[in-house]
Each structure stands twice: as C-alpha cells, then as structure tokens.
C-alpha cells in the first residue's frame, strides 16, 4: 500500500491549490520520478533503471508546448518516422510523456480504492488474492461439475476516442483530456503507417503504460454492463463475486463492488458465479462455463455480441465465440492448457450368488504445460533451437560465471515456480533440462572449451543441481523429508500465492 500513500501525499499538496484538477500535475517533476521509480513491468532480466536525468521537467514542458503549437491533423503518414513533435529521440520523449500521463490519471483511482478497502476493513487480507494461481483452485472445485465452456476474446476498442470518452465519465478535467488527446494522436501518427497498420491497444512491449490503462478502463466499462445484464436477466441473487488482483496500478468502484485493474491488462483476474453460469477473465480473454443446456450459453453469447456492437462500436460476429463441451475442449488460460478429463473405473460388486460390474466415470481437472509455445519462446531468447535442442547464449557469454549461472537459475526458478501446478511434470523437466544444458554450453563457450572438457574441469555438476532440486528443498522445510505428504506434494500440483506477474516466457500463446 506504499504507492497509495505516496500518491495521497502528492495529491493532497495540489488539492489546496488546484481544486482536484489533474492537468497541473503534468508539470510536476515528482510525477516523472514516480513513473520511473515504480516501474513494475520490467522483464525479469532487466534492472530498474530508476529516474535518470534524461526525464527532466524541462524536457516534459518543452514537449507539451510543442504539442500545443502544432496541428496534429496535418501530419502526413509519410513523415511519421520523422515526428516533428517528438524530435530526434521520439522513443525517449514519448515514453517520458506517456509515463507521466499514466501516473497522473491513475492517482485518483488508486486513492479511491484505498479508501474503499479501508472502509471495508480488508486492507490486510487483500494480498491473499494477488496471486495469478488463485484462480486455479476455483477451476479445480467448479469445472469438474460443468459441461459447456466458451472462450471469449474481448475485442480491442476500434478508436481511442471511445476509451477517452469512457474515462471522462470518471474524471472531470477538460484541459487534461485535451492534452491527453493531443498526445495520443501524436503517438499514433508516429507508429502507424499505411504499409504497417497496427492496433494501438495490441500487446506490444513498446506500448506506453497509458494505453494499457485505457484498455483496462474499456474492460471496466464492459464488465460493469455485463454484470448489470446478468442481474437484470436473472431473478436469482448473485451468490458471489470475487476479485483477484496482483500489481496494482489503478482501481474503480462499481456500486457496491470493488473492481480491481492493473497497468498491464494481463494481470486482472475476476469471476462471478450463480446457479447457471461461471465467468472468468484473465488478460483480454474471458471464459463462460455452464452445466446446463447450451441455450443459456447462446443467450450470453449474443448478449456480448450486441453489447460490443451497440455500446462500443466494435464489430464482432457470433462465429468468433464457440461453445464447446468441457471434457472435449482444452482451453489456454493463464499460461496453462486446461481441460476436464473423464476417468473410467470398473468396480466389481457381488450380492449373494450374483456379481455386477459397475462403471464409474470420474471427472478430474487437468493442467498442462504449453511445451511447444515455451520451446518457441526459449528459441527466440537464444536458449535452444526451434526443435528444442539447447544452445549457448552468445549475449551472456561475456558475463562472469556467477552472473551466467544466476541468470539461468532465475529463469528456471520462475518457470518452475509458475508451472508447478501442472498435472504432469515431464514437460516442466524438459524445460529445466534445456536451460541447464544451455547454461553449461554458455559457460563452455565463455571458457572456449567443449561441454565435456568443461565438465571435467569443473569436476562435478553440484554447481548446477539447483535446476532440479529447488522444489524439493522448499517443501522439505515444511514437511519432513521422509514424510508421505512431501512425496505426494512433490508429485502433485502446487499452487503458489506469491505469483504476482507472468513474464513473456510464461505468458506466450
């Protein structure tokens, strides 16, 4: 909750002079310090660069003045690579401005939820719901009794103005939104060309934090209307609504519910359930599941289609949403392939002189590691080839032995930590093997030796045993090493409550 306190202090300083307007905060130097000092989206191998002297208040003010002096409507697409506003270093300057906008617009929503949590007296318990893995126990408990499932991908808003207008219902500051529009148009002109059109809200590493914020606000509006339709279409009371969240960037309160969002839309988890339907969302993807006839699923399917078309002007066709039998369909969700498998058991029962064979069908929730996509990601990161054969990483060969081993171990631990919930660990062990051998080959390359010769010089492989023994060591701290519980947990699924983000290797489809 430290970020809320920082936001509260800075906002209170301006309230007495600016009457809650966000526009003056754009010219506050500490805003850009917050933007660079609280960067939680960096990759696992990147260090926090912090707030450097490049992102100074003077640069920000000059860029904003240029925005006002320039008519963005007359910029031709052919000049998009030489953006007049962004100057000679458009990537740096646009990042500075966008981070400042994001921090400013997130402040009131952070404060709003902070006050809501304090009133509800759940500030101390909110951390229990931060883990991405918190959703899978819900799957294990409920999905075994369901029959139909539908994967729904939430479409991107067709125009930035839709998201900006949605935001204006929450924040009343015309000068701020005028400046925000100027920046958004400038940025779009700099990245979109006739030869290479792209979606502004698509998941790209170069996308500023402000676009992720606008996308989440768009999803907020969509889910609030969806929840309203659910309440109006059913006479039954909503039995439960839960929100699971991780890194917190901004919040919103919808009537009596607290909806939680993050700066990265890949981090929001929410679900509600009643006697008929279950709804789960993670990233820009949601899942509808039901144990009843497909009629109810079709009803909600067309509800969503009409909602996107009529309220958000987003064209979507019914054919894009498919309704499948849960035990025949494997859906990709939160980095796992999940499905419900039917296990058939035969029991012999004897009554007097007659014996009977009774077939019992058991449903069990299974999770699988997406081995193909993970190998593709490892190949892109130069840890193996496209066939999954380990190779040396030439980029890291110039580092010290300790740094090389530490980097490989961090990746291996993160992947192992995230995928310990898989039903079968064979794929996870294969990923560990690729990283382990890639580490050895990288060390051998650095010392200009072969793998066999390097291992002989090393004398043993004890230095690299952590690739395979970490989970057992962690569990042995809780249970005796010889206990049956430890062996059962090590072989079974383990869901962690400290998974607060997923990196690109984990979260790639």
UniProtKB/Swiss-Prot annotation:
Task: Give the highest taxon in the source lineage.
Answer: Eukaryota
Q: Which UniProt keywords are listed?
A: Chloroplast, mRNA processing, Plastid, RNA-binding, tRNA processing
Taken from the UniProt entry, a GO cellular component term is:
chloroplast
Q: Write the gene name.
A: matK
Name the GO terms of the biological process aspect: mRNA processing; RNA splicing; tRNA processing
Q: Which Pfam families match?
A: Intron_maturas2, MatK_N
> Function, please?
Usually encoded in the trnK tRNA gene intron. Probably assists in splicing its own and other chloroplast group II introns.
| Family classification | Belongs to the intron maturase 2 family. MatK subfamily.
UniProt protein name: Maturase K
Q: Where in the cell is it found?
A: Plastid, Chloroplast
Gene Ontology MF annotations? RNA binding
